[in-house]
Structures are given as C-alpha cells and as structure tokens.
C-alpha cells in the first residue's frame, strides 16, 4: 500500500448513538478519552452521543466537542493498533482542530477549549440574527458567488467549496433562502437545507473572531509532526503564528475543500481515510474514480480500513 491521507470531518457528521459499535466491545480507550473530554468541557459527552441532549441548546453547545472527541478516540485506537502513519492530514472546518491534535501540534485539552469557545460564539451570533446554511448542488461556483453579491449589504457567503458540484452557502436566514431560490432558477439541481443552525464560515462570524484570536494567544501550537493542509490557504503551515492566524481566518472564511483534495492527489496520494463517526467526507470524495476511500464510522469499517492500509 502506498502513502495515504487522513481526513477529519466537521460539524454535521453527528448522529444519535454514533460510535456505538466501538463501545459495544467495551473499549476502555474510548471511555477514557470521552471521560477526559467531558471533564474539560464540564458536560457528559458520552451521554450526549448515546442519548442526545435533554436541552436543544446543550446539543448546539457541546456537539462540536463530541465530534472532535470522536475523531481523537478513533485515531488513538488506530495508533494503539500500530496503524500506519499518514503522509498528510486535513480536516474539514472543525475537523482542522482534530487534525492538529492528531499531528501533535495542539494538546487535546487546548483544542477542547478552543472548540468550546467556537461553539459559544456561534450561538451568540444567532441570538440577534437568524441564520441558515444550504448546499447548492449542480451549479457553477462563479454563478453562486455573483448571486450572493447581489444581496449585499445582507450577508450570504460561500462557506465551503466541497466539490465541483457542491457549494455550501451560509449567512442571514432570509437572504440565504432567497439566494437558494435564485440558484434553483439558474439551474441548480438541488438546494438542500443543512442541519447546522449557525452561519458557519460567513462574514457574520468575523466580529467575534477576535475572541478566538485572544484565546489562541494563551495556547501553545507546535509544528505538526505530520503535515496538515489548512482550510483557508490550502498549505501545510509549520509556523505557530501563521497556524494561529489561519485558524482565526477559518472562522469566517471559505473552506477550500476541493482544492485540498486536489492538492493531496497532486502528491500522488490516492488513498484517503476518514477518521470520524460518519461518512460525509467519504461520500464527497468517492465520486473521484481514481481514489480509494475508506472510513471508520463503525468498528467493522475501521477494521476493513486497517487491513486495507496494511
């Protein structure tokens, strides 16, 4: 098996009772990692992923921490089994923090601090300004961008370019809805509302990004031991200050996911392993005929991936 890349998912990859097959095997490693994370965020994350939150606001507040912890637990199991080291890592949005933890650039506890604040700031934004996130399927990004610009000064941003035919838009609720309708008239195959209640990667997030910047000043980030392709510049940054600046910008900038996958392919890496509780990134990538896509959303697929990559 040649080199492979590890990919880490972001918000939206959660579902009730995720990772259940890992816990059915009485995996002490998973319990230990979830207990550790729960202590840091002062909330029972294990109960959250098993049963869901009793209060909706708790789900919004802690689900990002749960997704981060899920990826870290799966990666630690991979390491415990002496799994092969990837040539590259990258994470989609929130997943960039998972990648940096697994590359030994950020301590897990520090990543939880950042993600907890990230969640809090996202919720703060929607109190005064209802938001919406939609996927536009089958329409050129230039057309979508031009439609978004027509709605200024209302804010609708391209949140993520996931592939040639899947663009995510985010921003003020009514404006996003109108942009979606206009995209449909211009030829989009589908316009799909996503299960995300905050205006991710839109200019609405820029005013609160200073708080992320302030927190990052107190956090040590080392040069990643495994190269991590970042979301905003599509490069493997090594410098602490530059990594921090990119993380602040990521809060309100477009996730350039298609370019990240193209960069990985340009390095002659055609095997990609998703480390997380779902198959969202795998489903995005599998349309590439020349790429082998593996995932770890359950224990069976984890073991298949482990065997394939070895």
Swiss-Prot record:
GO terms for molecular function: [acyl-carrier-protein] S-malonyltransferase activity. It is an enzyme of class 2 (transferase). Its EC number is 2.3.1.39. Coiled coil: none annotated. Pathway: Lipid metabolism; fatty acid biosynthesis. The active site is at residues 93, 201. Pfam families: Acyl_transf_1. GO terms for cellular component: cytosol. It catalyses: holo-[ACP] + malonyl-CoA = malonyl-[ACP] + CoA. It comes from the Bacteria. Keywords: Acyltransferase, Fatty acid biosynthesis, Fatty acid metabolism, Lipid biosynthesis, Lipid metabolism, Transferase. GO terms for biological process: fatty acid biosynthetic process. Belongs to the FabD family. This is Malonyl CoA-acyl carrier protein transacylase. It comes from Buchnera aphidicola subsp. Schizaphis graminum (strain Sg). The lineage of its organism: Bacteria, Pseudomonadati, Pseudomonadota, Gammaproteobacteria, Enterobacterales.
């Amino acid at each position: 098996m040649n080199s492979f890349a590890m990919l880490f998912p972001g918000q939206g990859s959660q579902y009730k009772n995720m990772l259940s097959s890992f816990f059915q095997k009485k995996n002490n490693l998973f319990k230990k990692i979830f207990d550790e994370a729960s202590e840091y965020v002062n909330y029972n994350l294990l109960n959250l992923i098993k049963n869901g939150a009793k209060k909706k606001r708790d789900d919004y507040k802690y689900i990002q921490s749960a997704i981060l912890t899920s990826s870290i637990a799966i990666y630690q199991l991979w390491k415990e089994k002496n799994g092969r080291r990837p040539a590259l890592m990258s994470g989609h949005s929130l997943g960039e923090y998972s990648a940096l933890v697994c590359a030994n650039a950020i301590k897990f506890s520090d990543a939880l601090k950042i993600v907890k604040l990230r969640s809090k700031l996202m919720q703060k934004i929607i109190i005064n300004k209802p938001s919406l996130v939609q996927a536009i399927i089958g329409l050129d990004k230039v057309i979508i961008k031009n439609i978004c610009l027509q709605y200024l000064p209302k804010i609708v941003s391209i949140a993520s370019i996931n592939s040639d035919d899947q663009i995510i838009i985010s921003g003020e609720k009514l404006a996003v809805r109108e942009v979606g309708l206009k995209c449909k008239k211009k030829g989009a195959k589908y316009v799909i509302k996503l299960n995300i209640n905050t205006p991710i990667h839109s200019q609405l997030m820029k005013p609160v990004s200073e708080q992320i910047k302030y927190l990052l000043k107190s956090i040590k980030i080392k040069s990643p031991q495994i190269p991590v392709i970042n979301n905003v510049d599509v490069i493997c940054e090594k410098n602490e200050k530059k990594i921090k600046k990119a993380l602040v910008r990521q809060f309100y900038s477009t996730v350039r996911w298609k370019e990240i996958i193209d960069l990985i392919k340009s390095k002659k890496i055609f095997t990609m392993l998703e480390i997380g509780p779902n198959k969202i990134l795998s489903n995005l990538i599998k349309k590439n005929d020349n790429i082998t896509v593996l995932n770890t959303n359950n224990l069976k697929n984890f073991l298949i991936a482990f065997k394939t990559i070895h």
